[in-house]
């Protein structure tokens, strides 16, 4: 048995499917932006508001503010940045405004986005060249707290998506 669709019905069905797909993609983008924002807030709070660093790490001092100002995120889709945190510059203990760090953080996030040519990529960065040195050699929490939070939230997001697609 076959059913003949009325004229224009196929196009209408295709349009509805496309709308649903767009809505799904927008929900993913919104959630990834929320996760990125929370991760950056956690990473910056560890230093600027005397938050608790990740287990096994210590907080670092904000001397020039360039390191904390370089912390932010970019959300990329198919290698192109579709949204980015503000990389807000904060003032250091020495009065330095942290604008250099803000600029370097943005540039580094954009550079890393190009390395992810397919799908979505949530990129959490500390853009100053000495960030890994401070974190790894001096055991200071630069991005660890933010990264751990992002990983946990992403796992939860994946679990929800998996459950929704099973239904």
Spans of model-derived segments:
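N-terminal, Lys/Arg- and Ser/Thr-rich interaction peptides
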Residues: 1-23
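Alpha-helix initiation and N-capping motif
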Residues: 10, 64, 154-157
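Short, low-complexity, charged/polar segments at coil/turn and helix-coil boundaries
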Residues: 19-131
């Amino acid at each position: 048995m076959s059913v003949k669709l009325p004229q224009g019905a196929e196009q209408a069905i295709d349009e509805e499917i496309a709308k649903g797909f767009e809505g799904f993609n927008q929900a993913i983008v919104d959630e990834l932006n929320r996760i990125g924002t929370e991760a950056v807030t956690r990473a910056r709070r560890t230093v600027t508001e005397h938050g608790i660093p990740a287990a096994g790490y210590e907080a670092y001092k904000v001397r020039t503010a360039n390191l904390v100002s370089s912390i932010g995120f970019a959300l990329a889709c198919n290698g192109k940045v579709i949204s980015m945190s503000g990389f807000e510059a904060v003032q250091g203990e020495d009065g330095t405004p942290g604008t250099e760090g803000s600029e370097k953080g943005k540039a580094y996030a954009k550079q890393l986005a190009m390395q992810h040519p397919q799908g979505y990529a949530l990129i959490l960065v500390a853009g100053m060249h000495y960030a890994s040195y401070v974190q790894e050699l001096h055991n200071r929490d630069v991005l660890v707290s933010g990264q751990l939070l992002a990983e946990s939230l992403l796992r939860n997001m994946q679990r929800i998506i998996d459950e929704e697609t099973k239904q």
